[in-house]
């Protein structure tokens, strides 16, 4: 079983892939280069909150690769933010706020951020991060219902933060990258002015993988999966799966708490009759297309 773009949520009984490895059980690899395993290697492939961070054509290539490395009859499980639910809640809160409901007006502001912020932000955390970290948040229960673990992490103090620190090598790379980018901005500012330097900073940020480049609902995701050969598409919950004993791995939920309640959970199957073929070779992606492990 393969977990693609696992981030900090993985099980050592799976094969785990991520752009940045913080553990020996995570293989460091850029999935924009494909998936580095032979055809038909896995009975299940899973990726959660990865697809929306890719451009549409990159997402299509990822699905092709998932199809390739799955054995016939294998299960693909995808988790993404649910555009349909976000849109419905946005319209519901909009109507209630328009009618004078002050509580709904607060929720409306959040739903507008949830819909747009990760698409348009130009700095880490955007508007959502500071909002969730605020001690004066008015609709904490609603926001917690929407984003789950992310809200708890934003509310946590440094003293109780339990997320594992990056390795020394990752920290060194981050410092080196920051140094290079800082000098690049200074050079651009000197040569082209402040506005061009600001454009460079924004471009560098948006290429790091935090932003969302596309959104999906059950209809568009079903169409996409069927286009690339999958069948038996179904929408499920965090606790339902064709993957044997899936719940025990706690990838989508801990006990009864769903990690990302704003998610759409789907599964589809590679047909038993599928003929395994090699994916079409392609050129190396530009550095700013690399998928970051940092997802929100």
Placement of each model-derived feature along the sequence:
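Conserved SAM-binding loop
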Residues: 1-86, 219, 266-272
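S-adenosyl-L-methionine-dependent methyltransferase catalytic module, highlighting the catalytic core
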Residues: 58-61, 65, 75-282, 287-291
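Short intrinsically disordered terminal tails
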Residues: 294-296
């Amino acid at each position: 079983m393969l977990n693609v773009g696992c981030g900090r949520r993985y099980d050592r009984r799976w094969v785990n892939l991520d752009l940045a490895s913080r553990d020996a059980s995570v293989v460091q690899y850029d999935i924009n280069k494909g998936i580095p395993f032979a055809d038909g290697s896995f009975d299940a492939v899973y990726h959660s909150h990865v697809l929306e961070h890719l451009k549409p054509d990159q997402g299509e290539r990822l699905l092709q690769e998932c199809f390739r490395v799955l054995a016939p009859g294998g299960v693909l499980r995808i988790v993404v933010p649910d555009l349909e639910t976000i849109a419905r809640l946005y319209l519901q809160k909009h109507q209630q706020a328009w009618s004078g409901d002050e509580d709904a007006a607060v929720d409306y502001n959040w739903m507008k951020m949830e819909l747009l912020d990760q698409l348009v932000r130009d700095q880490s955390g955007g508007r959502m991060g500071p909002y969730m970290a605020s001690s004066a948040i008015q609709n904490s229960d609603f926001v917690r219902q929407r984003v789950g673990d992310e809200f708890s992490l934003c509310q946590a103090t440094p003293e109780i933060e339990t997320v594992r620190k990056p390795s020394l090598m990752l920290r060194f790379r981050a410092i080196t990258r920051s140094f290079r980018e800082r000098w690049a901005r200074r050079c651009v500012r000197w040569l082209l002015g402040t506005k061009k330097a600001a454009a460079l900073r924004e471009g560098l940020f948006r290429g790091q993988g935090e932003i969302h480049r596309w959104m999906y609902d059950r209809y568009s995701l079903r169409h996409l999966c069927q286009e690339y050969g999958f069948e038996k598409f179904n929408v499920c919950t965090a606790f339902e799966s064709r993957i044997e004993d899936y719940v025990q791995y706690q990838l989508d939920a801990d006990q009864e708490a769903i990690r990302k309640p704003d998610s759409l959970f789907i599964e589809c199957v590679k047909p038993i009759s599928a003929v395994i073929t090699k994916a079409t070779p392609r050129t190396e992606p530009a550095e700013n297309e690399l998928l970051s492990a940092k997802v929100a």
